[in-house]
Structures are given as structure tokens and as C-alpha cells.
Amino acid sequence: MKAAVFIAPGQIEVQETAKPEIDGENQAIIRVVRASVCGSDLWWYRGIAKREANALVGHEAIGVVEQVSADVSQIKAGDFVIVPFTHGCGHCVACLNGFEGNCLNQKPGSNGGYQAEFMKYEPADSGLVKIPGAPADYTDEQLASLQTLSDVMATGFHAAKNAEIKPGDTVAVIGDGAVGLCGVIGAKLLGAEKIILLSHHEDRAALGREFGATDIVAQKGAAAVQQVLALTKENAGVDAVLECVGAAGAIDQAGQIARLGAVIGRVGVPHAEPKSNQLFWKNIGLRGGIASVTKPDKELLLKAVLDGEINPGKVFTRSFDLDHAADAYAAMDQRQAIKSLLVID
């Protein structure tokens, strides 16, 4: 089968590799229909994080189950499924408390190899989410939105839930990448009345407005803080902040624009240790981490996509076939795409 392989920073190749086989319990072999490049993939693509050479890559996909191990009871061959990037066992302390992204039984190295014609996933029963029907029942636009549920839309929703957004809240979203834009959708789903997107790029700001942002703040630094505060009641700050960047400065900025007692939902992969003293003095809560979107959340998002309530697939501004996976990475690295979609069927 064909699969995208990491060779060295800045170098992705599509190679012929062995098709995965069932070799344990609670496993499924999946024919991949759509995959995508995640912003976190750029860390090792750019050489910021280490990755072993010749590793199979990718952690976002939807596809059709081809085979399952004998013990699997909830999933069967022929099922169309979301293949999430988390691998929760469903029964450890972390999973039972809703943190499947921190599953205590996750196998090292199990998160990868989704950018391929076939992949193996475990635990099949607790992790895979069924999509009604078959891929042929959906338009390309719908398939793109379904693909976001494997990570980016789920991560944006995780930020919104962690920020404890309530109906009528004023919310700020820091970061106009795919996660931040999906955070806008998440905030709207939870009932936010005013959604302020901090964005320096016209195309991303326009998409943010389409997703539900009511205000765009294009300034940076202190000017951005002042503009956000001016959009809030009595200049007191927002009720919730979605931090979708990860830079220490983003957390600092979140603390500056949050009102007393607000909550920051943090999903940006950390770049450095932020200063947290201002959060203490303002009684601001800071929650978040690896998206641990539970099955009920995934099913809520799936229903929203199937009902046409949300269309997060619009974050995919470039599409590529698997043979051009290297171009998909380059497009995101060079900011020529908000997010790259791989069409594999």
C-alpha cells in the first residue's frame, strides 16, 4: 500500500509499505477515505520536535472498516467511521473521567500512520465513531466536515468546553488557524452571544465571520488588548478565552483580555512556560490540554455536521491526493493553506 513517510525535516515521501494486519485485541483495519495534515505535524516537519526517520505519519482520518479482531463487538467490517487521534481504552481512570487523550493504557507510538491507503486502529470498540451510511452517500464538502471530527473540530470544541462557555457569553478566540476557527464554531454551539476573533489575515477573518465570529480584532499586542476590552461591558474583559496558539505570549494576552473570574480554555500546544501570576490576581481559571473529546461530544458534533448546522470542512483550503502528500505539508508550512486535505479514495 502507499503511505506518507517522514524522511527528515522538510521531507515527506510517499512509499510502498506493508499493509497493516490484525495482530492483537480490539483492533480494526481501516481503508482510509480522507486524511489531513495537522498544525502539530509541522513541529517535526520543521525540525522543532524530533521524529524518527522513516516513520509513518498522520493522525486524522475517516474511512471504512475492512476487518476487525475477533473480540470487537461494536464495530464491524463495512462501517464508515471517524478515526480520532485519541486512543482511549474507555475504562481507565483518565478515560472514565473524560480524558481519553491522556489514556493510561495508550500504547507508545500508536498515534500515526493515518496518511495511508490503510491503517490499523486500536481500541476499535471504544475509539471509533460510526458515521451513518457509506462515503458515497456524502458530498465532498460533507466528507471534509466529517474529516474535521477526527481532530481539529473536536479540539476547537474542547477549548470551548474547557472555557466553560455559557449562553449569552462574550468570548475571545486567540488564533486564526484551523483550531481557532473551529473554536469559533464551538463557542457558537455552546451559545456565545459575542465572539471576538483575534486574526491578522483577511481570508481567515472572513472564514471566522462565516463560522460565527461577530467581531474581528486585527491589531497586535497592547492595541489588540485595548480593542478587545472596548468590545466588552464596562471594558471589563471577556467571559471566556479560547487560546489556540500555544505561545507564552498568547496565554499572557488571554489573561489581559479576560474579566475577573473568567476561564481560559487552552488547546494551543505549549511553546514555552507562560507567566501565570496575573491569572492568580484576577481569579482567572486556566484549563485545557490534549483534546479529550468524549464519544458523546463526538456524536454531538457528528449530528451538527449531518444536520448542516456546522460546516467546519471549510478550514480545508487546499486538497491533494496521497501521491502529493509532500505538497500538502509544504502548503501549510508556507501558509498557502489554512489546512490541507488528503483525498485517498
Please tell me what each predicted stretch does.
Residues 5-22, 39-67, 82-83, 96-112:
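N-terminal glycine-rich cofactor-binding segment
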Residues 22-35, 48-93, 132-139:
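Glycine-rich beta-strand-centered segment in the early N-terminal region that forms part
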Residues 27, 60, 79-80, 94, ...:
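Residue-level marker of beta-strand positions
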Residues 89-174:
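NAD(P)H dinucleotide-binding glycine-rich loop of Rossmann-like/cofactor-binding domains
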Residues 137-222, 226, 280:
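Mid-domain Rossmann-like dinucleotide-binding core that forms the NAD(H)/NADP(H) cofactor-binding site
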Residues 163-164, 206-287, 326:
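Glycine-rich cofactor phosphate-binding loops and adjacent beta1-alpha1 units
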Residues 252, 256, 273, 298-345:
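C-terminal hydrophobic helical "lid"/dimerization subdomain
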Residues 263, 275-314:
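Rossmann-fold dehydrogenase core element
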